[in-house]
């Protein structure tokens, strides 16, 4: 085994071990004893519907036209999780028909999530919380990972590992830290730096290309964060984008979450993936040019980098704008409907944050 390959293995294994240590330590610090750990104990069970036993409907008063307002579907289901696994459960689905898009009616064979809450007349011990979507989502993820492994091979495996670590850093470190009232700015920056370093070390290893891409990525993300801090006062940002933000603010009245800091976290976490993509693309292209033409002057190499960057910028700008529009399309439709002109739409805080 040559030295380069041995070094690559050492860096690879060290990155995985250090990532596990970091994630575990950060989780212990982030979890604390705050809001995140204070949850109502709700018993939920995954089950498969065996048969429909009864259906009932209630009619609203004459003021609303005497229309059917509620439908109750009673059914039996076999539990597939929890302490009651294997047992037959008696449950009910409550459908509010006054809404334009009520929940689909439960059918035999459906996989559902039930919540334990006996009703007054004793006809059901559980009620339908939602339809279970875990199985199709797992199949979709498995198919996605399979494609990555087929086309990426060793790089594909590295990509999957880095993706798992990235999700863990966000869901077991950053989110608990925010909910427990810790410094959102510090945790956001630390999380983004960790994601950048970990991903590049696993994908590329410890070399000049990794260093250049890492510096470019961290620098770009910090610039994005700095712009948010500078502009927030100029645009009179409140941090309240809709009712969900108010609910988040009131989770812990004694120590409310800083909504402006949440926006800061949104921006840099959302930017780190795109910036890392651009940084690695430029660094990889320049390394290939340098390997093929080692005698190329640094000035010419810099010009090549700028040319590549301009080409990437032309498509990446569209990518980012369309990604944000796509994720907020429903909100955009409502804004267009209830706004009198384009200026009023652009002046909204939701658009400013996006």
Q: Model-found features: residue ranges?
A:
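A short beta-strand signature
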Residues: 71-81
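Generic detector of multi-pass transmembrane helix bundles and their immediately adjacent loops
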Residues: 225-354
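Alpha-helical transmembrane segments and their helix-start/interface "positive-inside/aromatic belt" motifs
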Residues: 5-13, 208-221, 312-320
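Short, structured beta-strand/loop micro-motifs enriched in basic residues and often containing a Trp
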Residues: 89-97
């Amino acid at each position: 085994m040559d030295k380069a390959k041995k070094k690559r293995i050492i860096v690879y294994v060290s990155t995985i071990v250090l990532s596990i240590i970091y994630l575990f330590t950060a989780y212990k610090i982030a979890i604390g004893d705050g809001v995140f750990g204070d949850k109502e104990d709700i018993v939920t069970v995954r089950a498969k519907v065996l048969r429909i036993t009864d259906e009932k409907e209630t009619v609203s008063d004459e003021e609303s036209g005497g229309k059917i307002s509620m439908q109750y579907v009673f059914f039996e289901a076999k539990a597939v999780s929890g302490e009651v696994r294997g047992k037959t459960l008696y449950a009910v689905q409550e459908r509010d028909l006054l809404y334009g898009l009520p929940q689909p009616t439960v059918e035999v064979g459906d996989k559902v999530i039930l919540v334990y809450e006996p009703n007054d007349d004793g006809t059901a011990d559980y009620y339908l919380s939602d339809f279970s979507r875990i199985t199709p989502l797992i199949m979709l993820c498995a198919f996605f990972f399979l494609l990555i492994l087929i086309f990426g091979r060793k790089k594909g495996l590295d990509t999957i590992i880095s993706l798992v670590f990235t999700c863990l850093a966000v869901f077991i470190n950053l989110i608990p830290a925010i909910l427990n009232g810790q410094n959102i700015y510090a945790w956001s920056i630390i999380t983004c730096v960790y994601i950048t370093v970990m991903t590049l070390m696993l994908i590329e290893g410890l070399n000049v290309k990794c260093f250049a891409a890492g510096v470019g990525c961290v620098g770009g993300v910090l610039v994005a964060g700095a712009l948010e801090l500078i502009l927030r006062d100029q645009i009179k940002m409140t941090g309240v984008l809709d009712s969900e933000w108010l609910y988040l603010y009131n989770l812990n009245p004694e120590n409310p979450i800083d909504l402006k800091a949440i926006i800061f976290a949104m921006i840099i976490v959302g930017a780190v993936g795109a910036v890392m993509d651009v940084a690695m693309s430029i660094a990889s292209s320049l390394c290939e040019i340098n390997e093929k033409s080692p005698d190329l002057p640094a000035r010419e190499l810099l010009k090549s980098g700028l040319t590549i960057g301009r080409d990437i910028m032309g498509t990446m700008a569209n990518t980012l704008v369309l990604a944000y529009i796509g994720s907020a399309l429903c909100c955009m439709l409502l804004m267009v409907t209830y706004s009198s002109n384009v200026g009023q739409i652009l002046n909204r805080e939701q658009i400013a944050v996006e």
